[in-house]
Design a protein with these regions (language model features):
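N-terminal Lys/Arg-rich, disordered targeting/topogenic segments
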Residues: 1-3
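Hydrophobic membrane-insertion alpha-helices, especially the h-region
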Residues: 7-25
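Soluble "head" domains of membrane/secretory-pathway proteins
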Residues: 8-9, 28-35, 39-209
């Protein structure tokens, strides 16, 4: 094949690959509905799960969780893992203080995320024994086989505060691609970080799970 003939063939191959990729994204992806994960994810975004990642959770990853409530597929962020102790302290001046003690040992640290700081305005403490909201903040232990999850837009997210602990067995995959972008792209923003807890908010220890 001459170079003149090779160029159209290569271009045709590239077009075919692009078409196949588009079909794959449309067929295999999950469409985001609503704004509970804004600004990280927006309504209409398409997500592709990591192959073979069903039943996996890693701290601060985004996961696709099949909820027992109306069998809905949720897209949320993993915050607490089995054995962790978790609480949310809510005050008028600081309504969304997410506190975490990894594996129930060591210091209680604050989980901070820019979307939470920018968007959280409503007050509400956590956690009750099942991981939902509570009248006062209490550190609760995440049970075996479960995890604590939140949306990046706290005021508009139905997450563990509403539904309780998530079941790892019902995780259908970790989010691996968004509209063809890798999850580490700056477009998705930085992951939450653990910082030294400051301020007067101090959750009660809680009786355990």
């Amino acid at each position: 094949m001459t170079a003149r003939r090779a160029v159209p063939a290569v271009l045709a191959g590239l077009v075919l690959l692009c078409l196949l990729a588009g079909v794959a994204v449309t067929t295999l992806s999950v469409r985001v509905e609503g704004s509970s994960m804004a600004p990280t994810l927006r309504d209409g975004d398409r997500l592709l799960p990591v192959p073979g990642s069903a039943g996996e959770v890693h701290r601060f990853d985004l996961v696709l969780l099949r909820s027992r409530h109306q069998n809905a597929l949720l897209v949320k962020r993993v915050v607490g893992l089995p054995g962790d102790r978790i609480a949310i302290v809510s005050t008028p001046d600081d309504p969304f203080q997410v506190l975490l003690q990894e594996q129930g040992r060591g210091p209680v640290r604050r989980v901070t995320a820019r979307p939470w700081t920018d968007q959280a305005r409503r007050t509400g403490n956590c956690c009750a024994a099942d991981g939902t909201r509570s009248a006062r903040p209490e550190l609760r232990t995440v049970p075996a086989g479960a995890f604590f999850y939140l949306g990046d837009n706290p005021d508009l997210s139905d997450d563990s505060r509403a539904y309780g602990w998530g079941e790892i067995a019902r995780v259908e995959g970790r989010v691996g691609l968004r509209g063809g972008l890798l999850p580490t792209s700056p477009d998705l923003g930085p992951a939450p970080v653990l910082e030294t807890a400051r301020g007067p908010g101090s959750p009660a220890p809680g009786p355990g799970p």
